[in-house]
């Protein structure tokens, strides 16, 4: 059987930085989504994924909210850059669910965010998906966001939704995906609560729980964000983990190769 390969391009925490500018000078900077996207090499066995926190955090983000009044401009940008899947970050709720809906409603990419449901419901609003690549490889994709949104966000901005504990939500989705996926991938808008080399506790809160996700669940790939911390690809408890820095300073490229029963992820 011939090898089958999945390539993933991953960004996170762009915070509205689309162009190569920091808005502080006229000099071009080595940041921004367009800089990253110009290097994506996409084919039928490639997925382009974002880990959330796109809508808020830059003068452009403020202009789109204050002057245009909806998120369609950012949807158009993501469409142009060829995104396939996104999850939600805590700052994507900063302008309320109507604004968020105007972004998602015009987005070609699928949103996956398993722990976000309607206030009086239990089914996820943005459920996990199985994406079949051109080569036949089946990729099970789950998204989750830190439930600290409930602590930080203005109540009126999230009045119509419920954001639950990410781990039970991800675990339930993973259980459904395992038998129908060749590769399982989780997009987590959250970071690491422990040092990856030593296991030393960095934070005892529930804000960042990527280390625990790797301990308790068995995704093949965990794409993280939120901390604005560059984490090079490495394996933790059998799960391949990465995190890009913020504002499009870098993107992550992950390759998974399946050769019979063997998986190689780099």
Predicted regions located by residue number:
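Acidic, metal/ion-coordinating pockets
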Residues: 1-266
């Amino acid at each position: 059987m011939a090898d089958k390969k999945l390539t993933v391009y991953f960004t996170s925490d762009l915070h509205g930085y689309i162009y190569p500018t920091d808005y502080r000078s006229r000099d071009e900077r080595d940041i921004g989504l367009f800089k990253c996207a110009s290097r994506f090499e996409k084919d039928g066995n490639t997925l382009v994924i974002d880990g959330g926190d796109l809508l808020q955090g830059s003068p452009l983000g403020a202009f789109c909210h204050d002057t245009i009044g909806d998120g369609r401009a950012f949807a158009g940008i993501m469409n142009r850059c060829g995104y396939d899947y996104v999850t939600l970050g805590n700052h994507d709720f900063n302008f309320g669910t109507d604004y968020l809906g105007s972004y998602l409603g015009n987005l070609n990419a699928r949103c996956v965010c398993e722990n976000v449901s309607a206030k009086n419901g239990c089914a996820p609003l943005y459920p996990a998906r199985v994406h079949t690549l051109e080569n036949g490889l089946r990729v099970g994709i789950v998204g989750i966001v830190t439930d600290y949104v409930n602590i930080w966000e203005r109540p009126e901005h999230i009045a119509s939704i419920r954001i639950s504990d990410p781990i039970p939500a991800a675990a339930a989705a993973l259980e459904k995906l395992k038998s129908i996926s060749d590769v399982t991938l989780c997009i987590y808008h959250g970071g690491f609560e422990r040092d990856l080399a030593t296991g030393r506790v960095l934070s005892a809160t529930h804000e960042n729980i990527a280390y625990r996700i790797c301990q308790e669940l068995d995704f093949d790939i965990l794409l993280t964000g939120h901390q604005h911390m560059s984490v090079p690809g490495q394996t933790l408890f059998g799960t391949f983990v990465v995190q890009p820095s913020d504002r499009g300073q870098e993107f992550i490229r992950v390759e998974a190769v399946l050769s019979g029963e063997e998986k190689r992820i780099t």
